[in-house]
């Protein structure tokens, strides 16, 4: 950085410390990843200076011809990546994308089905603390108490009983394959619209490692970071018949000018995801997650639902007398970044929780393979076995540092 150190030394110091944190810790938060230098360059471009209210060819400001080129490329690449007729790349986040869809097909007070946050859903799927749970009438569905997988019989029963206008499929802490075809059958029976939130699994869907809802669902939303390895942002996919209503709900419905520098970075990320090596990356993400889950099971820990089909593992740490908060805080101190997470039928409040959520996208981007993930999994277990033993902490921290030094972060930094 050439100008920031002098212009704002306090911000510069904080950014340098964040660089060091990412370099010296193993990032295992399932919703985080590392963008490429190309994505980072697009994100920090002069497009941040340009206002471009409207859509390509229909802007409210002049001087948008370059912005039009960038947004059109992002749209076409997103459509190609997911095999979709329509794409809106303007949502600032996944939450904004979800709200735009709600506004497109629901009126205040209308009911919709969404996965219970306590069972792995997302805030925007009807949590009472979120606007989706305040404006509309959410009907939560959950997982089976024995298998800890989505209870499709319950979904069908609730749909028949409440006749919702919309059924939302998707999760933020669910490690198993989602059967979109079952949701489609249920929605058809009760005459409901369908929305799939694939924020966590979009990279898997794009590469064919998870069934796609495209063609079955009316609306598909996702974030552009997580497994897609793009900038933080949102994306809506649908059919051409929904283009007008969705465009209007994004702008001017809930947003003003789009973030053109972010859209440029999205376009670069979509292009990267269209390359053959991206599919190999997702293969490794899945292999790493499977290895991690297997290590936990071998070491006597309980993995929610017994394993994983995707990029994340939900681990019940209560079997070791720990809360999720204690486990996450302790792991942070030895160099592993995870988040506390509620597990299905959790007796602890969300701020305490009984589990931790771990993901493999960021470490896979960093270069770790299954053999490395086995080492990481064992180090995590070593710590959780004796979290208050100072000698054990020192040993585990040393092992983590060896791993971070083996896989440096230089390739993700701008000079």
UniProtKB/Swiss-Prot annotation:
Record flagged with keyword Chaperone: no
Subcellular locations according to the entry: Cytoplasm
One Pfam family in the UniProt entry: SHMT
Membrane spanning residue stretches: none
UniProt keyword annotations, A-Z: Amino-acid biosynthesis, Cytoplasm, One-carbon metabolism, Pyridoxal phosphate, Transferase
Biological processes, Gene Ontology terms: glycine biosynthetic process from serine; tetrahydrofolate interconversion; tetrahydrofolate metabolic process
Superkingdom to which the source organism belongs: Bacteria
Pathway(s) of this molecule: One-carbon metabolism; tetrahydrofolate interconversion; Amino-acid biosynthesis; glycine biosynthesis; glycine from L-serine: step 1/1
Binding site for (6S)-5,6,7,8-tetrahydrofolate: 117, 121-123
Major subcellular site: cytoplasm
A GO CC term attached to the entry: cytoplasm
Modification sites for N6-(pyridoxal phosphate)lysine: 226
InterPro entries listed in its UniProt record: PyrdxlP-dep_Trfase, PyrdxlP-dep_Trfase_major, PyrdxlP-dep_Trfase_small, Ser_HO-MeTrfase, Ser_HO-MeTrfase-like, Ser_HO-MeTrfase_PLP_BS, SHMT-like_dom
Site feature (Plays an important role in substrate specificity) residues: 225
One GO MF term attached to the UniProt entry: pyridoxal phosphate binding
Reactions listed under catalytic activity: (6R)-5,10-methylene-5,6,7,8-tetrahydrofolate + glycine + H2O = (6S)-5,6,7,8-tetrahydrofolate + L-serine
CDD domains: SHMT
Family: Belongs to the SHMT family.
Assembly mode: Homodimer.
PANTHER family with a match to the protein in the record: SERINE HYDROXYMETHYLTRANSFERASE, SERINE HYDROXYMETHYLTRANSFERASE 1
HAMAP family to which the protein is assigned, alphabetical: SHMT
Protein name (database record): Serine hydroxymethyltransferase
Species assigned in the record: Leptospira interrogans serogroup Icterohaemorrhagiae serovar Lai (strain 56601)
Protein encoded by which gene: glyA
């Amino acid at each position: 950085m050439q100008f920031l150190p002098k212009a704002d030394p306090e911000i510069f110091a904080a950014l340098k410390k964040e660089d060091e944190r990412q370099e010296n810790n193993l990032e295992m938060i399932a919703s985080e990843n590392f963008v490429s230098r190309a994505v980072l360059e697009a994100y920090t471009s002069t497009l941040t200076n340009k206002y471009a209210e409207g859509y390509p060819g229909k802007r409210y400001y002049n001087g948008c011809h370059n912005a039009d080129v960038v947004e059109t490329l992002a749209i076409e690449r997103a459509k190609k990546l997911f095999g979709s007729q329509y794409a809106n790349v303007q949502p600032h986040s996944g939450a904004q994308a979800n709200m735009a869809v709600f506004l497109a097909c629901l009126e205040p007070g209308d009911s919709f089905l969404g996965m219970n946050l306590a069972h792995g859903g997302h805030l925007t799927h009807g949590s009472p603390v979120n606007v989706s749970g305040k404006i509309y009438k959410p009907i939560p569905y959950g997982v089976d108490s024995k298998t800890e997988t989505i209870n499709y019989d319950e979904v069908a029963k609730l749909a028949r009983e409440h006749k919702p206008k919309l059924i939302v499929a998707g999760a933020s802490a669910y490690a198993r394959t989602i059967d979109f075809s079952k949701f489609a059958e249920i929605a058809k029976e009760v005459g409901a619209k369908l929305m799939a939130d694939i924020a966590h699994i979009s990279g898997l869907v794009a590469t064919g490692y998870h069934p796609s809802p495209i063609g079955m669902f009316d609306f598909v939303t996702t974030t552009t970071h997580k497994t897609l390895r793009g900038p933080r942002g949102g994306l809506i996919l649908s059919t051409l018949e929904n283009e007008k209503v969705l465009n209007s709900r994004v702008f001017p419905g809930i947003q003003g000018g789009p973030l053109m520098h972010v859209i440029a970075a999205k376009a670069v990320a979509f292009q990267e995801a269209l390359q053959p090596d991206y599919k190999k990356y997702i293969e490794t993400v899945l292999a790493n997650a499977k290895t991690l889950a297997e290590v936990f099971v071998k070491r006597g820990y309980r993995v929610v639902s017994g394993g994983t089909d995707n990029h994340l593992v939900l681990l019940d740490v209560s079997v070791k007398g720990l809360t999720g908060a204690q486990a996450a805080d302790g792991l942070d101190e030895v160099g592993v970044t995870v988040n506390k997470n509620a597990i299905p039928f959790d007796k602890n409040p969300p701020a305490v929780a009984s589990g931790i959520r771990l993901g493999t996208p960021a470490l896979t981007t960093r270069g770790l393979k299954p053999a490395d993930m086995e080492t990481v999994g064992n180090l995590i277990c070593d710590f959780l076995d004796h979290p208050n033993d100072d000698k054990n902490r020192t040993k585990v921290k040393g092992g983590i540092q060896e791993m971070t030094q083996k896989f440096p972060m230089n390739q993700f930094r701008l000079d």
